[in-house]
C-alpha cells in the first residue's frame, strides 16, 4: 500500500514538474560583440549659451554640457488656446514631465491679409515664448511656411493661391513671401534663442515636404482635391502620415528647397542648436544640417482601423517608422518627435484612443532606440475664427470647425487624461535616468522581425545596454486587439560578455494583458550593483545625503531585488518588499554609502509628479507648480489627499480642502434638437474653472452664444465636457448657451469605419436615428493651494 502511494506521489511530482517545465518560456538576448559606432563632428548642429552651456549632437544622441540627454517634446499650439490660459497650460505640460514645447506658427493666421501681420492676443508668439522662459520650458518653433496641422490650406494664406507661382518650391516669387514671413517671425523671436540665454533650442523647417500636403480650402463640392504643393510634386503628395514607396523623381529639387528655407531662416536671425525636418515617408531633408524627425500613429483617422506595427520592437534608428527614408540612418539620432498618443477626429472617421496605447507606444519606441520622444499633440486646443468670417479648420478634410481636442494627454480645455499620467511614468524615468539610457544601444532577440501584430503568444521585448548594464523593455499591448491575454511563465536570459544573467533567478513572472514595463539590470545604485529588479525604476532623490531610489511594482509581478554581494555589506542581497509607501528598505555599499529603496504600487506611481526641486507629490489631482507655490486642481472634489516626499511627514498622507460650491444649471430641451442651458457660476478664488458636462448620443453637436458658433463636437461615445471659464464675460451678458444636435444614423460613415468600440455604440434595433440627451451638469474644478515651504501648516494629517 505504501509503495503504491509512494509511486503515485512520484508520478504526480513528475507530471507537475514536466508541466511547469513545459510552460516555462525562456527568452534569450545576447549582448553584441561588435562595438557600437557613434559618429561625431559631421553634423552642423549645436550651440552655446551665454552662461557657458553647450548643446551638441552626435549620430546617436544630444548632449548638454557634456551629459547625454533625452528631450521629451510635447506639441502645444499657442494660437489654438486663450492667451490668458497659456501659463497654466505650460505648467501642466511641465508637471507631465515634458521638457520642450514645439509650436506651429501658422502663416495664414498671422498674415491673413497680404502684408498685414498680427502678433496680438492669442497670436502673441513672443509672449508665449517669454512665459515658457519664465518657467524654464524650452521651445522648438515650427516656422513653416507649410505646416499642415489640420489647418486651412495647411497654414498657407488664401491669397497665396491667387499668385502666379509654384508654392513650396524655389520659385523666386514664392520665396519673396516666405522671406518676408521669416523676417517677421525673426523679429518676434529676437533675443529669445538659446544663444541669447533664451528657451528656443530648435527651429523646424517646413513640414512633410515631398511627403504630404493639405487640400486647398477654395474648392467645390465633388471636385477632386487640389493639394498645397508644387505642381511637380502632386503625384507624390499624400494625405496623412504613411509609407511612401514611390521614387521621388524631384528629390534633388525638394532638398534644394529645404536648404534654401534654412538659409532664409538663418538670415532672419533664427540661429539655434537644433534644426529639424520631417524624416519619415521619404520626405525631403537637409543633409547634415537638420535632424530628421519621425512619427507613428496607432489610430490614424486617414486609414481603416487595423493592428499597427507600432507595438513591435525594432532598431528604430536604422529602420525608422514609415520607411523608406531619404537619409543615411547611421548619421542621425532617432528623434521620434511626432508620436500619436492621441488623434484628431474627422466627420467620417472617429478613432477612439485606448489610453494604454500611449504607454505601450512609448515603451516600445524608447526600447527600440529613440533618443528623443515627443507627441503630436500633447495639448489640444480650439481653432480660432477667421477675421473675415469662416473657420481656420481644414474643412475639406472633414475636421471639426473649432474642436482640436486631439484626444491629447491634455485636452481641448486643459483637462488631463489617463494617458497624461501613464506617460508621466516614462518622463519621470527619463528625467532621472535619461543620461544613462541615451548612450545605450538597442539589442533585439532573434526572430523579433518575424513577430506579427496579431501574435498574442510571443513576448515582445528588447533591451538597451552598454557594458553589460541596461534596461529591459516589454509590452503586452496591441492596438485594435481586444483578445490579448496575460503572458505567463516568463523568464529572461541575458547572455552578457562576462556572465549569463537570468531574470528572475528562480521561478518565472507574468506580464499582464495590456501591460508595458521597463526593468533594470546590472545597474549601479550609488556603488551597489543591482543585478536585476522585477520592478520599474521611477526616480532618484537625495535625502539627507543618502540616495533614495523609487521603483514601482508592475501589476501582477512580485517585486524582487537582487544585488551583487561584492558591492554591498551584510549577508542579505535579495529583497522581496510588498509594494506601497511602507516598503522602504536600506542597504550599505562596500564603500559605506547608505541606499534607500521604496517600491510604490503602480497606482501610486501613476499619481506621482516630480516637482522642480526633485521632491515627489502623490495625488490624484492635477499638479500645477510655479516658482512660489504648488496648486492642486481637482474636478468635482473639494478635498484631496496627497503625499509630499521627502518632507517632515515622511510618507504620511495629507489632506487639504477648500469650501465646496454647488453651481446651478438649468437646461431645457426644445423642439427635439435644441438645448438651452442657463448657469449660475460664482467667481471664487478657489475655483479654477467650471465644466459643463453633457451626456448625449447623437452625430454632431454645436454650441452658440449670441448667435455665434463657439464650439463643436463630434460624438464618439463619451460625454462632451466644456470649459466655461473662457466664456464667462459673454455669458454675463447673454445668460445662456444654446446647443444644436443632429441625430445619429445607424449607417453613419464613421460607424462603418469602425473607430468607435462596439460597446460604445447605441442600440439601433428599435430606430434608425437616435438623439438622446440624458444629463447636463456643471462641475466645479477646485484649485487647492498647498504651498511648499509651509504645506504642513495648511493641511492636516489624515
Question: What function would you assign to each model-found segment?
Answer:
Residues 24-100, 767-780, 784, 789-795:
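N-terminal carbohydrate-binding accessory modules
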Residues 163, 175-189, 196-204, 209-211, ...:
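Carbohydrate-binding surfaces of carbohydrate-active enzymes
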Residues 40-43, 47, 141, 146-153, ...:
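Substrate-binding/catalytic cleft of secreted carbohydrate-active enzymes
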Residues 683-706, 714, 739:
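Aromatic-lined ligand-binding clefts that engage carbohydrates, nucleic acids, or primary amines
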Amino acid at each position: 500500500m505504501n509503495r503504491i502511494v509512494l509511486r503515485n506521489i512520484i508520478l504526480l511530482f513528475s507530471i507537475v514538474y514536466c508541466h511547469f517545465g513545459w510552460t516555462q518560456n525562456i527568452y534569450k538576448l545576447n549582448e553584441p560583440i561588435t562595438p557600437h559606432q557613434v559618429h561625431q563632428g559631421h553634423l552642423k548642429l549645436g550651440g552655446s549659451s551665454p552662461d557657458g552651456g553647450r548643446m551638441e549632437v552626435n549620430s546617436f544622441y544630444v548632449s548638454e554640457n557634456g551629459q547625454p540627454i533625452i528631450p521629451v517634446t510635447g506639441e502645444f499650439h499657442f494660437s489654438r488656446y486663450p492667451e490668458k490660459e497659456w501659463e497654466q497650460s505650460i505648467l501642466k505640460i511641465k508637471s507631465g514631465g515634458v521638457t520642450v514645447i514645439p509650436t506651429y506658427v501658422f502663416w495664414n493666421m498671422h498674415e491673413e491679409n497680404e502684408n498685414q501681420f498680427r502678433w496680438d492676443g492669442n497670436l502673441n508668439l513672443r509672449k508665449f515664448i517669454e512665459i515658457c522662459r519664465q518657467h524654464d520650458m524650452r521651445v522648438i518653433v515650427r516656422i513653416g511656411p507649410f505646416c499642415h496641422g489640420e489647418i486651412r490650406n495647411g497654414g498657407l494664406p488664401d491669397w497665396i493661391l491667387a499668385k502666379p507661382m509654384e508654392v513650396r518650391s524655389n520659385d523666386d516669387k514664392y520665396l519673396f513671401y516666405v522671406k518676408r514671413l521669416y523676417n517677421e517671425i525673426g523679429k518676434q523671436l529676437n533675443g529669445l534663442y538659446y544663444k541669447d540665454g533664451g528657451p528656443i533650442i530648435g527651429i523646424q523647417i517646413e513640414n512633410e515636404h515631398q511627403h504630404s500636403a493639405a487640400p486647398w480650402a477654395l474648392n467645390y463640392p465633388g471636385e477632386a482635391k487640389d493639394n498645397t504643393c508644387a505642381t511637380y510634386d502632386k503625384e507624390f503628395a499624400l494625405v496623412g502620415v504613411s509609407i511612401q514607396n514611390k521614387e521621388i523623381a524631384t528629390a534633388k529639387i525638394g532638398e534644394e528647397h529645404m536648404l534654401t528655407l534654412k538659409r532664409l531662416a538663418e538670415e532672419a536671425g533664427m540661429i539655434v542648436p537644433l534644426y529639424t525636418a520631417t524624416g519619415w515617408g521619404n520626405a525631403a531633408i537637409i543633409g547634415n544640417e537638420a535632424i530628421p524627425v519621425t512619427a507613428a500613429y496607432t489610430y490614424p483617422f486617414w486609414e481603416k482601423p487595423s493592428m499597427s506595427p507600432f507595438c513591435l520592437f525594432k532598431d528604430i534608428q536604422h529602420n525608422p517608422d514609415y520607411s523608406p527614408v531619404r537619409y543615411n540612418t547611421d548619421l542621425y539620432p532617432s528623434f521620434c518627435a511626432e508620436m500619436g498618443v492621441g488623434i484628431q477626429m474627422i466627420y467620417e472617421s472617429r478613432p477612439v484612443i485606448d489610453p494604454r496605447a500611449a504607454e505601450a507606444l512609448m515603451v516600445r519606441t524608447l526600447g527600440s532606440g529613440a533618443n528623443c520622444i515627443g507627441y503630436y499633440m500633447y495639448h489640444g486646443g480650439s481653432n480660432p475664427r477667421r477675421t473675415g468670417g469662416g473657420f481656420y479648420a481644414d474643412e475639406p478634410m472633414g475636421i471639426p470647425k473649432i474642436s482640436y481636442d486631439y484626444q491629447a494627454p491634455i485636452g481641448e480645455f486643459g483637462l488631463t487624461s489617463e494617458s497624461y499620467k501613464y506617460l508621466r511614468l516614462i518622463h519621470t524615468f527619463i528625467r532621472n535616468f535619461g543620461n544613462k539610457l541615451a548612450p545605450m544601444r538597442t539589442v533585439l532577440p532573434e526572430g523579433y522581425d518575424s513577430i506579427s501584430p496579431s501574435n498574442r503568444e510571443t513576448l515582445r521585448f528588447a533591451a538597451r545596454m552598454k557594458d553589460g548594464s541596461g534596461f529591459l523593455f516589454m509590452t503586452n499591448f496591441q492596438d485594435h486587439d481586444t483578445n490579448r491575454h496575460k503572458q505567463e511563465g516568463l523568464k529572461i536570459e541575458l547572455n552578457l560578455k562576462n556572465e549569463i544573467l537570468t531574470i528572475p533567478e528562480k521561478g518565472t513572472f507574468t506580464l499582464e494583458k495590456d501591460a508595458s514595463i521597463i526593468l533594470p539590470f546590472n545597474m549601479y545604485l550609488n556603488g551597489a550593483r543591482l543585478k536585476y529588479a522585477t520592478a520599474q525604476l521611477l526616480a532618484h532623490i537625495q535625502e539627507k545625503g543618502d540616495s533614495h531610489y523609487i521603483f514601482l511594482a508592475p501589476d501582477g509581478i512580485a517585486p524582487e531585488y537582487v544585488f551583487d554581494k561584492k558591492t554591498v555589506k551584510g549577508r542579505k542581497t535579495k529583497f522581496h518588499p510588498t509594494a506601497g509607501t511602507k516598503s522602504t528598505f536600506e542597504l550599505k555599499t562596500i564603500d559605506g554609502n547608505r541606499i534607500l529603496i521604496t517600491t510604490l504600487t503602480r497606482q501610486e506611481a501613476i499619481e506621482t509628479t516630480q516637482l522642480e526641486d526633485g521632491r515627489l507629490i502623490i495625488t490624484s489631482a492635477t499638479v500645477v507648480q510655479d516658482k512660489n507655490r504648488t496648486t492642486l486642481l481637482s474636478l468635482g472634489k473639494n478635498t484631496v489627499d496627497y503625499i509630499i516626499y521627502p518632507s517632515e511627514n515622511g510618507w504620511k498622507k495629507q489632506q487639504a480642502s477648500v469650501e465646496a460650491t454647488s453651481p446651478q444649471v438649468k437646461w431645457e430641451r426644445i423642439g427635439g434638437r435644441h438645448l438651452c442651458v442657463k448657469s449660475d457660476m460664482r467667481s471664487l478664488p478657489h475655483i479654477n474653472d467650471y465644466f459643463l458636462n453633457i451626456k448625449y448620443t447623437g452625430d454632431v453637436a454645436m454650441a452658440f452664444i449670441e448667435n455665434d458658433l463657439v464650439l463643436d463636437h463630434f460624438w464618439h461615445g463619451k460625454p462632451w465636457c466644456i470649459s466655461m471659464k473662457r466664456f464667462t464675460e459673454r455669458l454675463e451678458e447673454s445668460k445662456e448657451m444654446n446647443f444644436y444636435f443632429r441625430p445619429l444614423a445607424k449607417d453613419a460613415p464613421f460607424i462603418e469605419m469602425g473607430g468607435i468600440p462596439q460597446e460604445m455604440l447605441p442600440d439601433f434595433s428599435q430606430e434608425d436615428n437616435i438623439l438622446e440627451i440624458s444629463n447636463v451638469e456643471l462641475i466645479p474644478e477646485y484649485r487647492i493651494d498647498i504651498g511648499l515651504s509651509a504645506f504642513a501648516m495648511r493641511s492636516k494629517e489624515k
